[in-house]
Amino acid sequence: MVEFRAYQEEARYFKYAFNAAGKVVEEAPLIVTENGIVSRAMDASHIAMAVLEMPWEMFDEYEPPSDELMYGLDMEEVTRIVRRARVTDEITLEGEDEEEVIIKLGSSGYEREFRLRSIDIDDIPDEPELDFAVEVTVVPDFIQDAVRDADLVSDTVKVGAKGNTFYFKAEGERGRVIPKVQEGAEALLTFEVEEDVETAYPLDYLKDMIQAAQGAESVRIRLGQDMPLELTFRIGPAGEGKLTFYLAPRVEE
């Protein structure tokens, strides 16, 4: 018996969001309620956390369950499936008796159905509540380019704000890179800074997280001195959903 059904005519939003989350966390719950679908999970090393929120408004059709349901997902398997989505594909998520999640991809009468057995999830973390000194919103291209540029010279990147400038900074034996954007630039959609900040983060995680930028409308970045970095990718036709990552700072000796 189908317990819930969620349909969206553009599978690409889910393709990039699930692909990015699946690179960061190995297992994740899928919590389904009358308000939509939510997932929260930590990576095995507890360095990063992924929070996916898909409210019912994000879907073209949403048939909620009569009671809250939870499925456990092997994110590697989910990633393998959503990568198969074509540009023109629609996507449908369905669940049966908290035992199976069904993912349907296709268009124009051609459909592929994938079934995933639900796995046991031991712990569902709470989303942290943090007070950040810096909050900016950028176009997705900026953070993609900044992370890829930093990766040319180092495995660590410093993210910061000083005056009216928001920047990434990476240094290594191969050189130095400083992608930056100033208040008023088209790439910087919002800019709120209480104090100057600069904190270092591991690039390998950021390279995985920015995969979500391909399907995002915008990216909110929040940070504080020696605090976790928060990245929020707005997803969906009108940015109704969001994928948020938290990344612990890199302690420098």
From Swiss-Prot:
A single GO molecular function, which one?
A: DNA polymerase processivity factor activity
- Keyword Acyltransferase assigned to the entry: answer is no
GO biological process annotations for this chain's record? leading strand elongation; regulation of DNA replication
Give the InterPro entries listed for this entry. Answer: DNA_clamp_sf, Pr_cel_nuc_antig, Pr_cel_nuc_antig_C, Pr_cel_nuc_antig_CS, Pr_cel_nuc_antig_N
Q: What does this protein do?
A: Sliding clamp subunit that acts as a moving platform for DNA processing. Responsible for tethering the catalytic subunit of DNA polymerase and other proteins to DNA during high-speed replication.
The record's comment on protein family reads: Belongs to the PCNA family.
Name this protein carries in UniProt: DNA polymerase sliding clamp
Q: Which organism is it from?
A: Methanopyrus kandleri (strain AV19 / DSM 6324 / JCM 9639 / NBRC 100938)
Q: What is the lineage of its organism?
A: Archaea, Methanobacteriati, Methanobacteriota, Methanomada group, Methanopyri
